[in-house]
């Protein structure tokens, strides 16, 4: 049974518009191919990190994904997020 999820990605701040759009399109395709529905993508903008660095960056671009999917779909997508060098961090929450 599909559940509602929210995933926040922190993306490298040095990506220009075209590579960023390509990254988001790839991620959207991966989710849809694995059965995710109701996908909404929101760009939350660039923010400085609070006194620390992630992979030598002091800021990151926050992108929020809201969707409904099976748990196995989320696990498959997170495997892809782990190996993508443009993504500094991510966190997925199940929404009630």
Swiss-Prot record:
Matches recorded under SUPFAM superfamilies: Ribosomal protein S6
Q: Which family does it belong to?
A: Belongs to the bacterial ribosomal protein bS6 family.
Where on the tree of life does the source sit, at the highest rank? Bacteria
Name this protein carries in UniProt: Small ribosomal subunit protein bS6
Gene name in the database record: rpsF
Q: Which residues form a coiled coil?
A: none
Q: Which HAMAP family match?
A: Ribosomal_bS6
RNA-binding: present as a keyword of the record?
yes
| Its biological purpose | Binds together with bS18 to 16S ribosomal RNA.
Keywords attached to this Swiss-Prot or TrEMBL record, sorted alphabetically, are: Ribonucleoprotein, Ribosomal protein, RNA-binding, rRNA-binding
Q: Name one GO biological process term.
A: translation
Pfam families under this entry?
Ribosomal_S6
Q: Please give the organism.
A: Synechococcus sp. (strain JA-3-3Ab)
Q: Name one GO molecular function term.
A: small ribosomal subunit rRNA binding
Q: Which InterPro entries match?
A: Ribosomal_bS6, Ribosomal_bS6_sf, Ribosomal_S6_plastid/chlpt, Transl_elong_EF1B/ribsomal_bS6
GO cellular component annotations, sorted alphabetically?
A: cytoplasm; ribonucleoprotein complex; ribosome
